[in-house]
Amino acid sequence: MNTGHGTGQQIHPIVRVPFSAGVPLIEATFAARSGQFLVEAQMGGRMVRAHVADRGRLVDLLVPGARLLLAPREEVGRKTAFQVVAVYQDSDLVSLDTQLPNRLVAAALSLRALPQFARYGTVQREVQLGPHRIDFRLSEGLDTCLLEVKSVTRVIDGVAVFPDAPTERGSQHLELLTNAARNGQRAAVVFIIQRSQGVAFAPDETIDRAFSRALRTARALGVEIYAYLCPVTPTGITLGHEVPVFMSLSAVPSELRRRL
């Protein structure tokens, strides 16, 4: 289970951030996926093409008839006039804005709303470490912490899971954090669950066995692993409460799933 502090309904400053698009969103209906990053959608009686930034397979979310929230985009050189920022799964709004988790964590760190990292006064973003970049480097004097953020959108039987597609980059980030922890450096990963439903977090070994292995190794060697359930509305995302972390779906107690 989680190697960090306790889980549950923590009291912290309210942290909300808007969608990256920064414009009013338009509702549309998903019709088909025409490429890894392209979708066709019905909007106001016409078909439109929209870009989706999330690299996951999204097979549970992007189903015919699903309600989408699109942001109009007019940047020069764009091939699509719209960006998919969220999708409804039943009544649960799920963010597909890949920039939102890092922006949420950055805001939470600035407000010291994450108790695990509240002692750090300096926050550096996108820190280069060899060939890779780590999302945050936190410091207070000589005390430092490397922090990586991952976006979670998929839920299986009430458990939020990651990844939604094989991620060699994700495994490399975990290996980097593991090496840092092995050398005495504090290191952590925070999984931001971009939806309001989910009672726990676990890696999905059926999608990426290597990532699941790397996560177990990271935890065993001192990398701290946290997961936060972060409700999404049409205006943005809010930092919610921490949920317990397990190293496999089968390890999640059935009584915990029944709380959903």
Curated annotation (Swiss-Prot):
InterPro entries recorded for this chain?
SfsA, SfsA_C, SfsA_N
A Pfam family of the record is SfsA_N
Q: Which GO terms describe its molecular function?
A: DNA binding
- From the UniProt record, list the coiled-coil ranges: none
Q: Please indicate which superkingdom the organism of origin belongs to.
A: Bacteria
Of which family is this protein a member?
A: Belongs to the SfsA family.
This protein is called what? Sugar fermentation stimulation protein homolog
Naturally occurring in which organism (per UniProt): Chloroflexus aggregans (strain MD-66 / DSM 9485)
Name the lineage: Bacteria, Bacillati, Chloroflexota, Chloroflexia, Chloroflexales
